[in-house]
Swiss-Prot record:
GO CC terms: cytosol
Residues that bind L-glutamine: G354, L382, G383, M384, Q385, E405, R462
Membrane spanning stretches: none
High-level lineage: Bacteria, Bacillati, Cyanobacteriota, Cyanophyceae, Synechococcales
Organism annotation: Prochlorococcus marinus (strain MIT 9313)
Binding residue positions for Mg(2+): D71, E141
Known partners and oligomeric status: Homotetramer.
Name listed for the protein in its UniProt record: CTP synthase
Length: 558
């Protein structure tokens, strides 16, 4: 039978509940326990798929095609475990399910209320994750802050959950903030006390307090917090501000979070294997030479809009012993100031996904600059579509070529709507979503990077390369290096003779993991490193490779 952990937050929003949940998952998995993590979001949207990235950050896509909160990306990256649509629950989806049941008559004419019907549906979703995943421990993060009206049904549901499984099979973690007041020179505990008081009023007594702080918390302060909040001193965990989110599991392990959880849940403490994670953090703190990467996007004012892309770049840099020097470049600024002014000195360019025509001309200009200047380039989703448009306009002779999404009346719709999307009216959850196979063409950069004939990648799009232009693109020098198994959909393109120029219709960033970077991102960083001044050892290695390559070439004499 599964054990259950519930993570709540108090005092302020964005306090790091998701990272705490993901870190605990990592620590449990390091001891041999299987873990699944779900997020309960208190907003009324059914899912974040139709929300602006400025409102919500990126939309993370699961294997089964759910559009979810970005925290699910943290869960997957930290635990190296795939989540599903069951792991993302919103107030909107709960109410939708309950109302649908009422319309079908499932409640036999009864009055439908928040308690027990809404809270019962929430509890059912948590049980469903446990049954579907078969995990030893199910961790549930409750979005929002204790005291918010929107979160009350979720908090009531996790209070009721204690009656479902018994007190020995669940634990409550409350993440809170200890603010430092400079004038008094003290960390203040009163906000934490009041936050726990709010929880107790609902009927939840936390087992562990994870206290965010920018400085160490001494034992006297832990004793004070524990006494006022009703938890043992050892269960008051310091969560110091970290230089990287990947350092948080190590910090929480040193503070004893996992041991306390195992004790509360009556689980055996096995030997912990965090060696690879410790090595990863050591690399983060002792990076190699910096690689300058420009991320050219529409939503660069909010970094979370491209969270998985940035993490994938970091993973690749870690493996390649490089540090990431990321430049956030607004695509619209390129339209005004030109790519040569904003991208000069970059070692690589990434154009990620997005929607709408704002900034597209800037992305197209950035791609042309990377192509002509022979700067390594990686395009993702809309980034691939922009690469196709750039080639059509500047190399294939298709003046005015565009996407039918951006310019419905274009004479050359090199990107067009997928046939199965023709009659789709609703926006939410109706795109080509989730994992699909991609067949890799032999003797291509993609085949070299992947080392596989067929790969499986996550998608989120409505528009695709227009096969009416396929032969023209191939004849003009484009290489289609990946397509759907039936050959109908172009999934991956590249340019031969360029140091690194490739773009994909899918989202490889969702599959990148610390210590296991995605092949496309690793290839990009490896190509970018070749632009850096070589150390003496590296210069010898490159010369050796050049000599070997020369020896392998057939002789032109005789």
């Amino acid at each position: 039978m599964a054990k259950f952990v519930f993570v709540t937050g108090g005092v302020v929003s964005s306090i790091g509940k998701g990272i705490v949940a993901a870190s605990l998952g990592r620590l449990l998995k390091s001891r041999g326990y299987s873990v699944s993590i779900l997020k309960l979001d208190p907003y009324l949207n059914v899912d974040p798929g139709t929300m602006s990235p400025f409102q919500h950050g990126e939309v993370f896509v699961t294997e089964d095609g759910a559009e979810t909160d970005l925290d699910l990306g943290h869960y997957e990256r930290f635990t190296d475990t795939a989540m599903s649509r069951l792991n993302s629950v919103t107030t909107g989806s709960i109410y939708q399910a309950v109302i649908n049941k009422e319309r079908r008559g499932d409640y036999n004419g009864g009055t439908v209320q928040v308690i027990p019907h809404i809270t019962g549906e929430i509890r059912e979703r948590i049980h469903r994750v446990a049954a579907n995943s078969g995990a030893d421990v199910v961790i549930t993060e409750i979005g929002g802050t204790v005291g918010d009206i929107e979160s009350l049904p979720f908090l009531e549901a996790i209070r009721e959950f204690r009656g479902d499984v018994g007190r020995n099979d669940l634990a409550y973690i409350h993440v809170t903030l200890l603010p430092f007041i400079g004038t008094s020179g003290e960390l203040k505990t009163k906000p934490t006390q009041h936050s726990v008081k709010e929880l107790r009023a609902i009927g939840i007594q936390p087992d562990v307090l994870v206290c965010r702080s920018d400085r160490p918390i001494n034992e006297d302060l832990k004793s004070k917090i524990g006494g006022f909040c009703g938890v043992p001193n050892r269960a008051v965990i310091t969560a110091l501000d970290a230089d990287s989110i990947y350092a948080v599991p190590i910090s929480l392990e040193e503070e004893g979070l996992c041991l306390e959880m195992l004790d509360v849940l009556n689980l055996t403490d096995h030997d912990s294997d965090m060696k690879s994670w410790v090595e990863l953090v050591h690399k983060l703190r002792n990076p190699g030479p910096a690689v300058k990467v420009a991320l050219v996007g529409k939503y660069v004012q909010l970094n979370d809009a491209y969270l998985s892309v940035v993490e994938a770049l970091r993973h690749a840099c870690l493996t390649q012993d490089a540090s990431l020097e990321l430049s956030w470049v607004c695509a619209e600024q390129i339209e005004t100031h030109g790519p040569e002014n904003l991208l000069k000195g970059m070692d690589a360019v990434v154009v990620p996904g997005g929607f709408g025509n704002r900034g597209v001309d800037g992305k197209v200009a950035a791609i042309r600059w990377a192509r002509e200047q022979r700067v390594p380039f990686l395009g993702l989703c809309l980034g691939m579509q922009c690469a196709v448009i750039e080639w059509a306009r500047n190399q294939a002779g298709l003046t005015g070529a565009s996407s039918s999404e951006l310019e419905p009346d274009t004479n050359h719709p090199v990107i067009h709507l997928l046939p199965e999307q023709q009659d789709v009216v609703d926006l939410g959850g109706t795109m080509r979503l989730g994992v699909y196979p991609c067949r890799i063409a032999p003797d291509t950069l993609a085949q070299k990077l992947y080392g596989e004939q067929v790969v499986y990648e996550r998608h989120r799009h409505r528009y695709e390369f227009n096969n009416s232009y396929r032969n023209l693109f191939i004849e003009s020098g484009y290489t289609i290096s990946g397509s759907s198994p039936d050959g109908r959909l172009v999934e991956l393109i590249e340019l031969k003779g360029h140091p690194f120029f490739t773009a994909c219709q899918y989202h490889p960033e969702f599959l990148s993991r610390p210590g296991k970077p995605h092949p496309l991102f690793r290839g990009l960083i490896e190509a970018a490193q070749l632009r850096l001044p070589a150390s003496p050892d590296e210069a010898l290695r490159r010369q050796s490779q050049t000599n070997i390559s020369a020896q392998e070439q057939p002789s032109r004499i005789g």
